[in-house]
Amino acid sequence: ALARIKSYQYYGMFQPIQIAATVALNGPRDCVEEIRDTYQHRRNVLCESLNRIGWKVTPPRATMMVWAEIPDRFKKMGSLEFCKLLLEQAKVAVAPGIGFGEGGDNFVRFSLVENEHRIRQAARGIREIF
C-alpha cells in the first residue's frame, strides 16, 4: 500500500515547476513573439546564406536549430570529420549528426543562438571552403 501511495505522490512534474509553467503560458505573449521573431530571422539569414553558396538547406518550421545535410562532395567524410573541417578551416562550430545516432551521420546541426552578425560571419567562413 505504501508503494502505491508513493507512486502517486512522486508521479509527475514538481508542483512549483507546474505553477511557473502555468503563469508563463497564461502571461503576456509579447516576449514570446519577440523571441520567435528573433530565431526566425536568424534561421532565415543562415539558410539563405548557405543556399547562396550552394549548400542546399531547408529552413525548419519551428526550432532554434538547423539540421543541414552534408553536401555531396563532403559526405564521404562523415559528420565528425566534416565538423572538424568546418572548425579548422571555416572557424565554424557545428554539432556532428553522428552524435544523435547513426542515421545522423550525413547531417550537421547548427545552433541559432548567435546574433545575425556572427551567423553571417560563419557563412562567409563556410563559403571559403566551398
List where the protein language model places each region.
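PLP-dependent class I/II
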Residues: A1-F130
